[in-house]
Amino acid sequence: MDNQLHFCTVDEAVEEIRQGRMIIVTDDPGRENEADLIIAAEFATTEAINFMVTHARGLVCAPLSPERADALQLPLMTSVNRENMSTAFTVSVDAAHDITTGISAAERSLTIRTLADP
C-alpha cells in the first residue's frame, strides 16, 4: 500500500471517492487554510466516521444540493448568514429511525447514508 503523501488531480480525487476511499481536500491559505476529510455517503461506515471524529476533530458535515435539502424540508440554520465564509448550513439532523442520541459514529453514519438515499 502506498502511504506516500501526494496531490492528485480533481479527476483522480473523484475516482478515489468513487472507489470508496476517503480523501483529504485542502483549501487556499487565504480562505480558511484547513483540510477536510471527504468520503461518499454510501461508504460512510461507522469506522470511517470514527476515524473522522478521532483524527479530524471537527464538524461532520453532509453536503446536500438545494433540491435535496428542500425535499427533506431542511431549512437553513439562519436566515441571515453572518458566518465568515457564508457557508449555507442547514439545521442539524439525525436519522428519523434507529437513532438514540445521534452522537455515536454508528448513528452519524446512518444519518449520512439516510440523507443521501433518495
Describe the predicted segments one by one.
Residues M1-P118:
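Catalytic domains of riboflavin
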